[in-house]
Regions:
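Membrane-interfacial helix-loop-helix modules of multi-pass inner-membrane proteins that assemble, modify
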Residues: 9, 137-155, 179-181, 193-230, ...
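Membrane-interfacial loop-to-transmembrane alpha-helix junctions, especially the N-terminal start
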Residues: 29-30, 65-77, 117-131, 180-189, ...
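A membrane-periplasm/extracellular boundary helix in multi-pass inner-membrane enzymes
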Residues: 203-206, 262-263, 283-331
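N-terminal signal-anchor transmembrane segment
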Residues: 3, 10-112, 138-143
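Aromatic-anchored transmembrane helix interface
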Residues: 96-106, 126-138, 147-172
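Structural signal for the C-terminal ends of transmembrane alpha-helices
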Residues: 44-45, 60-69, 107-118, 167-180, ...
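Alpha-helical transmembrane segments of multi-pass inner-membrane proteins
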Residues: 56-60, 132, 163-169, 181-212, ...
Length: 339
């Protein structure tokens, strides 16, 4: 009985008004900008491993303290972005396996201390069930029994089939538990700040190697460009979403795409511009009051590109050359297969 009473007191403490207010503060733009400033220190001094470990600790602490599962999302994203620079670092991080155990305990503690009755009926529950069924049964009749029950196949079935359904149920239960804020507003704020941090990482790298940029007059190669480009692409639609209420947020979308160009990612070059076009078209169609303002912004950008087209193509030409080379390689391969 004593242990039960102690456990009850601990749960009551972590669900007290003071802890709840702390959790609410961890979802504010001010707090996320504090995390931005901290993450910037690790980027500037190029101590990525220390940055990953620090934000892993912050994520774990936030999981224990906060009832809302959205609160640990910002530090986790900062962790992921800093971690993109830690290429082939398994031998480094395996030394901190004890921290991994602690983080798993933090995840378990979150669900124990902030237990909620699972919300089984969500907006996407039925589609997720159909997707899970398709993943589980998709190979039946097409692959052999041995292939179907292989380790890799079982992993994908459990992770992408059952796992994604369970993950959706968990997030549907534990995100936005208080219902006193707009989930999309908070999520868009987080993603725009993360996009700004990704842009900062790219800008910081270029400033660090500015002499090389001046000498070569072209973009720089860095290993983490594709991963960083992915985060920037994820952030573009959220910048436009916030632009519905704050017009200046739209400029962040163009800034993120410019950062994608600086990464030299071919996928980012192509799919990023598709994202921008889709977002712009939606704004032209539905935001009639500011339609002329958007046209003016695009006209200025196009005019600037026309004036500096030679310099633009010269600086970013390496990415375009790699893209055309990849396309030619695919076409040649298809021609050989046709023969």
């Amino acid at each position: 009985m004593k242990r039960y009473a102690q456990m009850k007191k601990i749960i009551e403490f972590f669900n007290s008004p003071k802890i709840s207010r702390m959790g609410e503060y961890m979802l504010t733009g001010r707090y996320i900008m504090v995390l931005f400033a901290l993450a910037s220190v690790f980027v500037i001094f190029d101590i990525s491993v220390a940055g990953v470990l620090t934000f892993a600790c912050i994520t774990g602490i936030t999981l224990v303290l906060c009832e809302d599962l959205l609160a640990p999302f910002p530090p986790f994203l900062f962790l992921c972005l800093i971690g993109t620079k830690c290429y082939n670092s398994f031998s480094v991080f395996i030394q901190y396996k004890a921290l991994g155990v602690v983080l798993i305990i933090c995840v378990i503690m979150h669900f124990v201390l902030h237990w909620k009755k699972p919300v089984l009926k969500g907006f996407l529950t039925l589609p997720m069930i159909f997707v899970s069924a398709a993943v589980i049964l998709g190979g039946v009749g097409f692959i052999s029994k041995r292939e179907y029950f292989s380790g890799a196949s079982i992993f994908y079935i459990l992770a992408l089939g059952v796992g994604m359904l369970l993950l959706y149920t968990v997030f549907n239960t534990h995100i936005n538990v208080h219902k006193d804020y707009s989930l999309m507003d908070k999520l868009s704020l987080i993603m725009v700040i993360i996009g700004c941090f990704g842009t900062f990482m790219v800008a910081s790298y270029y400033l660090t190697h500015i002499n090389e940029v001046i000498d070569t007059k072209t973009i720089l190669y860095f290993q983490w460009r594709n991963n960083c480009s992915t985060f920037l692409m994820l952030s573009i639609p959220f910048a436009f979403y916030r632009g519905n209420k704050k017009s200046y947020s739209i400029m962040f979308g163009f800034l993120f795409y410019f950062a994608i160009l600086l990464t030299g990612s071919r996928g980012g070059l192509v799919f990023g511009v598709i994202e921008l076009m889709m977002c712009c078209i939606l704004f032209f169609l539905y935001d009639r009051e500011r339609r002329f303002a958007y046209i003016a912004i695009l006209a200025c950008i196009c005019f600037a590109l026309m004036i500096f087209s030679r310099e633009f193509l010269s600086f970013f030409g390496y990415t375009f050359d790699r893209l055309m080379s990849a396309i030619n390689g695919v076409l040649v391969g298809e021609q050989k297969e046709g023969r």
